[in-house]
Design a protein with these regions (language model features):
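C-terminal catalytic lobe of FAD-dependent flavoproteins
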Residues: 101-179
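Short, ordered coil/turn segments that flank beta-strands lining enzyme active or ligand-binding pockets
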Residues: 3, 65, 152
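Generic recognition of long tandem-repeat/solenoid scaffolds
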Residues: 1-2, 72, 139
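Core beta-strand elements of the Rossmann-like FAD/NAD(P) dinucleotide-binding domain
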Residues: 2-11
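Active-site substrate-recognition segment that forms the wall
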Residues: 11-135
Length: 179
């Protein structure tokens, strides 16, 4: 049910990121999923540019798609649906990035933001057919790399829904949670 009324269909995919568990409650399904907050920022450096990602222990620095900018990320915080940006946390990210790449100390902060990543209890995606509802499929819990893997996830889900794949990947199957 939406603000515009009911939406009909033959098959449904529950793929609503960090909000999937809330929607699943409407089906009397306890989806073992919670949001994990990630804070990050974008910096600008006029004299330095690179086109690859640098990974540190707790931080990464990635080139921004436009200009001489970098994205610095990111945190993993179990704070529910809190999407506030915390200046001290952003400062810590920048300090960690400067330990990896000292020229970051001269960078200007352009913007900062948060994202809520859907994490299943075992940190593995929940993808496949529901055993409770014959026309329901799950595609959620992709956590930190979900957006990067979207094309592969879509191909996998299409193969499941169309019956082109005989077996689900057991580590991703909703059956591991009796869904």
């Amino acid at each position: 049910v939406t603000e515009e009324g009911k939406v009909g269909g033959d098959q449904f995919v529950l793929a609503s990121g960090s909000w999937s568990a809330q929607l699943a409650k409407g089906l009397d399904v306890n989806l073992p999923l919670k949001p994990i907050k990630g804070q990050m920022c974008r910096l600008k450096l006029d004299d330095h540019f690179f086109d690859y990602t640098i990974h540190g222990m707790m931080t990464y620095i990635a080139p921004w798609k436009e200009g001489n900018g970098f994205v610095v990320g990111s945190t993993m915080e179990d704070k529910g649906f809190d999407s506030s940006i915390e200046g001290k946390v952003i400062d810590t990210l920048i300090e960690r990035a400067a330990e990896i790449l000292p020229c970051i100390k001269d960078a200007s902060l352009i913007e900062s933001w948060t994202g809520l990543r859907p994490a299943a209890n075992d940190l593995m995606p929940i993808m496949g057919k529901s055993w409770r509802y014959k026309n329901l499929f799950y595609s959620s819990g992709h956590y930190r790399n979900g957006i990067l893997q979207t094309p592969n996830q879509a191909d996998y889900m299409v193969s499941i829904i169309k019956g082109l794949r005989k077996n689900e990947i057991p580590e991703f199957s909703p059956s591991r949670y009796n869904l």
